[in-house]
Amino acid sequence: MIPNTLAMPREKPVHWVGSAKKDYQTFPAAVQDEMGYALGLAQLGARHPHAKSWKGEGPGVLEIVEDHRGDTYRAVYTVHFADVVYVLHAFQKKSKSGIKTPQEDVKLIGERLKRARADFESKGTS
């Protein structure tokens, strides 16, 4: 018998913070598919090639951006915490000019990151 030396990584659960899941579910199916793939990679400890660090929150907070029929959709998630992926925010970019994220979305992501941290710490995991 040959031992299995290629152990598959354990899939981390996804926890949705606030209205992130409800908002994500309003995205077009093609956008959900691509973002779902990115989240699936995060669950396995990998990173989607288009995922980029979310500015201001460090390397463990990532953003995936998808364009679809002239609209731009974003999902921000964190892999800061062991054994879980938290989706902090999912939103459609409203501005038609520039790439800057509206301040209200930036603030919401910061607040939800704090909620994710509190949730993680309440479970006694580190």
Sequence positions of predicted segments:
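Basic, Lys/Arg-enriched alpha-helical interface segments
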Residues: 1-72, 81-84, 94-126
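Hydrophobic/aromatic beta-strand elements that line small-molecule binding cavities or substrate pockets
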Residues: 75-77
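Conserved catalytic cores of phosphodiester-cleaving nucleases, focusing on short active-site segments
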Residues: 86-90
